[in-house]
């Protein structure tokens, strides 16, 4: 993050980016949050973060210099690797544990109990925009195993105990639950 500017109850963020091929109005997933490019230069872009988004996400804790995950939106015909991540954050969660197991990493986190109906073993979840497979769920805590590539090329390697992450439940789980209600 290059710059943060408060504007009433919202925020304007300027982000260094090596992403290519985006334009004004493009949606970019920023640590899991779908943000719209409102201006851009060669190596940076700006986006507005609304009051609602500030309240629902960890953006309120962002600081200049923080490294965040960035990903452009898919286009029809693009490969889908992982699950559908929309950038519509449900809530935040907190890191419980992160430690190495063999060549992988064990990550556990707590989530609000009202989301348990969408979080299932071997289902998908997005943390800070990273598509992950849920290994186990117990009460309002679950864990995922992180492969070395994901650990190295995302912000997971920076996580500390109690760090606040953006959580988006799997939209297919949400729709499946909705159709059964």
Annotate each predicted stretch with a short phrase:
Residues 1-181:
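Conserved loop->alpha-helix
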